[in-house]
Amino acid sequence: MIPGEYVLKKEPILCNQNKQTIKIRVLNRGDRPVQVGSHFHFFEVNQSLQFHREKAFGMRLNIPAGTAVRFEPGDAKEVEIIPFSGERKVYGLNNVTNGSVEMGKRK
């Protein structure tokens, strides 16, 4: 092994395999760009982003951890969202949920 060397598998790395996905169209109606990170509760994103919010409850972007999607002013794009895993609890963010993301249990 060489210091700093990476030894990677030849098979592709599959993220979020076998997760239920939903595609939604998002429009930035604001005058500033909005960037949303991989694990942000999509239901609670900036209010300048227009989309079917109810569909996004308990969901996050289907993108690799540590990455984000940027929505420029006036731009519309389709994104794929997936359900949170684990205990399915969300705290902080825009202080809307603060607990379980099971449907019907939000503030």
From Swiss-Prot:
Main location (coarse class): cytoplasm
Domain of life: Bacteria
Coiled coil segments of this chain: none
Reactions it catalyzes: urea + 2 H2O + H(+) = hydrogencarbonate + 2 NH4(+)
GO cellular component assignments: urease complex
Record GO biological process: urea catabolic process
Principal EC category: hydrolase
UniProt pathway annotation: Nitrogen metabolism; urea degradation; CO(2) and NH(3) from urea (urease route): step 1/1
MF terms in GO: urease activity
InterPro entries documented for this protein: Urease_beta-like, Urease_betasu_sf, Urease_subunit
Keyword Lyase: no
The protein's Enzyme Commission number: 3.5.1.5
Localization in the cell: Cytoplasm
UniProtKB keywords: Cytoplasm, Hydrolase
Pfam family, one: Urease_beta
Family under the similarity heading: Belongs to the urease beta subunit family.
UniProt-listed PANTHER family: UREASE (PTHR33569:SF1)
Subunit structure, as described in the record: Heterotrimer of UreA (gamma), UreB (beta) and UreC (alpha) subunits. Three heterotrimers associate to form the active enzyme.
Name of the protein described by the UniProt record: Urease subunit beta
Record gene name: ureB
